[in-house]
Amino acid sequence: MIKTVMAGAVAMALVSFGANAAGNNTDQGHGVVNFKGTVIDAPCGIAPESADQSIDFGQISKSHLGKDGISVKKDLNIKLVNCEPNKSVEVTFTGATIAGAATELGTAGDTGTAVVISGQDGKPVEFGSKGAAQSLKEGDNTLHYSSWVKKATNGTVKEGDFTAVANFNLTYQ
């Protein structure tokens, strides 16, 4: 009799557990993970946060820019990962520049502004030209640049939104 009662209790426990598990069909969260990347033939990889960047300069005073002022400088870093030792890299920035001003990246939005990028030495980079070779150590390396907004050469600063796109290409030695 005790064996029958025990068997019945075990059976009831299993049935009630199964009923609870089967009755809980509410969505308690789900998601999708997409993976992507690119294999490149280079001595270093580029960290994902460096390969596709967005820099927000916020709201900049028209009168300040009109008096040859500049926006707050923003860091523009290119992180190289898993680098081979004894290599160097030259960076070339490209983009639509202001006519006659190879160091000024033109902006879309008719605001009379330009974006400037400078290297670690503080000198503006010339778009379309290779920068000085930078030595790399084994492992991770970060190439440091600064960027800012200014009145475009021969421009008149106007209110409004602007955008600009610069690309960079790396050449290793």
Labelled PLM ranges:
Residues 2-7, 19-173:
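Mature extracellular/passenger domains of Gram-negative fimbrial/pilin and adhesin proteins
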Residues 11-19:
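Hydrophobic h-region of N-terminal signal peptides that target proteins for export
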